[in-house]
């Protein structure tokens, strides 16, 4: 059983993982990627201390920082969550696995609504941003 299961690996999820791991709690982060919406951002200019950085670079730096601690990354989608009779959280994954944890933090973030126009996907992060 894991102390903390975190759904989402964007800035909030990675920060939660860092804080929990530094307190010597066992941590699992469940996501389909590391970085979330940052990965689709060409340039970030409002992150304190890093005035000009690409979303990919910032996600990479955050990932490296978190990986200095024993955090288990689980690359899967989440189908559902529930609480069992003992108060533990069950996280059902799209690969059929079920994770069990004492605490659940949901930082699923969001995905932008796309316009579905020609060139949108190929230029996302390179001129097209949301």
Question: Where do the PLM segments sit?
Answer:
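A generic structural signal for alpha->beta connector loops
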Residues: 24-26, 70, 125
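N-terminal Rossmann-like dinucleotide/flavin-binding domain of flavoprotein oxidoreductases
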Residues: 39-98
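N-terminal glycine-rich anion-binding loops that anchor highly charged ligand groups
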Residues: 26-39
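A broad detector of short, well-ordered amphipathic alpha-helices
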Residues: 14-18, 64, 106
């Amino acid at each position: 059983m894991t102390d903390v299961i975190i759904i989402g690996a964007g800035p909030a999820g990675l920060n939660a993982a860092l804080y929990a791991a530094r307190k010597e709690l066992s941590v699992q982060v469940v996501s389909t990627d590391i970085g979330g919406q940052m990965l689709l951002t060409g340039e970030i200019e409002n992150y304190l201390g890093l005035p000009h950085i690409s979303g990919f670079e910032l996600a990479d730096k955050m990932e490296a920082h978190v990986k200095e601690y024993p955090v288990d990354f689980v690359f899967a989608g989440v189908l559902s969550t529930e609480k069992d009779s003992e108060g533990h959280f069950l996280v059902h994954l799209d690969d059929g696995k079920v994770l069990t944890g004492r605490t659940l933090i949901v930082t699923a973030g969001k995905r932008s609504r796309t316009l579905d126009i020609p060139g949108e996907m190929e230029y996302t992060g390179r001129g097209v941003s949301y």
